[in-house]
Amino acid sequence: MRLTTKFSAFVTLLTGLTIFVTLLGCSLSFYNAIQYKFSHRVQAVATAIDTHLVSNDFSVLRPQITELMMSADIVRVDLLHGDKQVYTLARNGSYRPVGSSDLFRELSVPLIKHPGMSLRLVYQDPMGNYFHSLMTTAPLTGAIGFIIVMLFLAVRWLQRQLAGQELLETRATRILNGERGSNVLGTIYEWPPRTSSALDTLLREIQNAREQHSRLDTLIRSYAAQDVKTGLNNRLFFDNQLATLLEDQEKVGTHGIVMMIRLPDFNMLSDTWGHSQVEEQFFTLTNLLSTFMMRYPGALLARYHRSDFAALLPHRTLKEAESIAGQLIKAVDTLPNNKMLDRDDMIHIGICAWRSGQDTEQVMEHAESATRNAGLQGGNSWAIYDDSLPEKGRGNVRWRTLIEQMLSRGGPRLYQKPAVTREGQVHHRELMCRIFDGNEEVSSAEYMPMVLQFGLSEEYDRLQISRLIPLLRYWPEENLAIQVTVESLIRPRFQRWLRDTLMQCEKSQRKRIIIELAEADVGQHISRLQPVIRLVNALGVRVAVNQAGLTLVSTSWIKELNVELLKLHPGLVRNIEKRTENQLLVQSLVEACSGTSTQVYATGVRSRSEWQTLIQRGVTGGQGDFFASSQPLDTNVKKYSQRYSV
């Protein structure tokens, strides 16, 4: 109950009690005064009768006694000698208004002039019909009504006076609930005004500190993964991501393409053409490459060395790489002519296919060799290191057929991988999906870009959530996490379906569901995600953000969204004990989550040294082959192990 409501109720109660006690006291005083006055009148009649009985008999005095009885509303007079009735006189009934009732009182008066005798007088109660008359009760009713109206107006006035304090209290509640930013700044109507201004000042300082912390986190990320000059990913980050893919922790046979893109040596050109012109041309080509690679989901572009750029294309084939190289050369051909560069001999591309199990240095050496071969061919061209490798890719038609068959058959194969706390207790199990194409299994990292490309993400996510809910009944002790695409989650139709589906589940089941979202998509669609995340949180479902650290995004979303888990990308965890920049980045993410309910978990943990380093940097839990590898989901298992060695 709010302060204004409490205070108004308290004042109303006190005023009401005061009025009630006053009315009760006045009524009792009025009643007693009337009764006292009337009893004295009746006693005066008894005294007059006693005086007349000295000289006359009772029967002779009947007319006089009757007149006295009428003046005092006495209805019967009994003359008693001790307890024996000597005489009695009753007055005939007089006119009474319709609806009136007779209430009688009795009074015995000893006769002073006739010792041993007494008069018993029965008279009408003067208050018996008082409240039956509108004229007599109208002033009292009007007074009570006036008091009630004044009390109502006083409470209204009091509420208006305290409305500013109520606004301040409401804003304080919103702040305690975690709201920040310009939405919780005060207004001129809040009271006390100095308290409101002080609160606004503190909020602005907190907002500035948060922005500075976010800029610092972004700076740390850029230091760990960004090239200073171009803003692209640097060589260290590129090699780290390639090594993570080559390790293939899920053992699904990852593959892809590395493209080495060599531009002219701009350091030599600056001696001839000047630094400013060369820099302008360099950034023109860099922007062209960056914009071009954005067309391909999952592609990673990095400045590898001086004028050499490297592009990592996971799950792509040589045929697709040749098409990409041809389109890139056509894009370069559209640049305007200039005297500095020969547009027909400006770019050389080396293409190298890689498979899981290879070495990073080996793959990059092959790409370098292919780039040199492209340069020897002359003109804008590309070269492939070894085109004898069997193709593992699929065309769009085959991909669509495979995905539609998977959806029609009930969804992909499910695997589970536990995430454990520092103590070794299982926090949740992540459900990981794979498709069997007839020969081998395909991981979700490979087929999900095609699901998004074909516009089947909403159908796919509905199927996955529908499969997740029955599993909660099989394992009532397990928290289950599943990845959901942000593209589906921001659609109103999917939001309505998700709300209706979750409301059909028991609350205890909803609390064990964790929805995982990619950090890059969260940072891009944060404003559209806020309402739906509030919805799922209100239903008891928890939210996690994975692939943290993969892309250069601000960490401001951590304060704006109620997220339970932040999962680090495996590339950030790999050999972290040897990479101080990655340790600094992890520590900054942990500090960004301080003051919130968000916990940081690491994924792809392979060794004890990595795990110990992560614990030292404040990570709450981990997931990876160091604890347990992915296992097929088996509904025949009644209970999974709840503890793993750490």
UniProtKB/Swiss-Prot annotation:
Pfam families assigned: EAL, GAPES4, GGDEF
Keyword Ribosomal protein set for record: no
Domain comment quoted from the record: Removal of the transmembrane regions (residues 1-156) has no effect on csrB translation, however removal of either the HAMP-like region, EAL or GGDEF domains obviates the activity of CsrD.
Disrupted-gene phenotype: Dramatically stabilizes CsrB and CsrC RNAs, small RNAs that sequester the global carbon storage regulator CsrA; also decreased transcription of CsrB/C. Decreased biofilm formation, decreased expression of DgcC, a probable diguanylate cyclase and of the curli regulator CsgD. Decreased expression of the curlin subunit CsgB, decreased curli expression at 28 degrees Celsius.
Domain EAL as annotated: residue spans: 396-644
UniProt lineage: Bacteria, Pseudomonadati, Pseudomonadota, Gammaproteobacteria, Enterobacterales
Transmembrane segment boundaries: 10-30, 135-155
Protein name as annotated: RNase E specificity factor CsrD
Gene: csrD
Parts forming coiled coils: 194-224
Keywords: Cell membrane, Coiled coil, Membrane, Transmembrane, Transmembrane helix
Induction, per UniProt: Expressed at low levels at both 28 and 37 degrees Celsius.
Lineage: superkingdom: Bacteria
Topology within the bilayer: Multi-pass membrane protein
InterPro entries: Cyclic-di-GMP_PDE-like, EAL_dom, EAL_sf, GAPES4, GGDEF_dom, Nucleotide_cyclase, Rev_trsase/Diguanyl_cyclase
Subcellular localization(s) per the UniProt record: Cell membrane
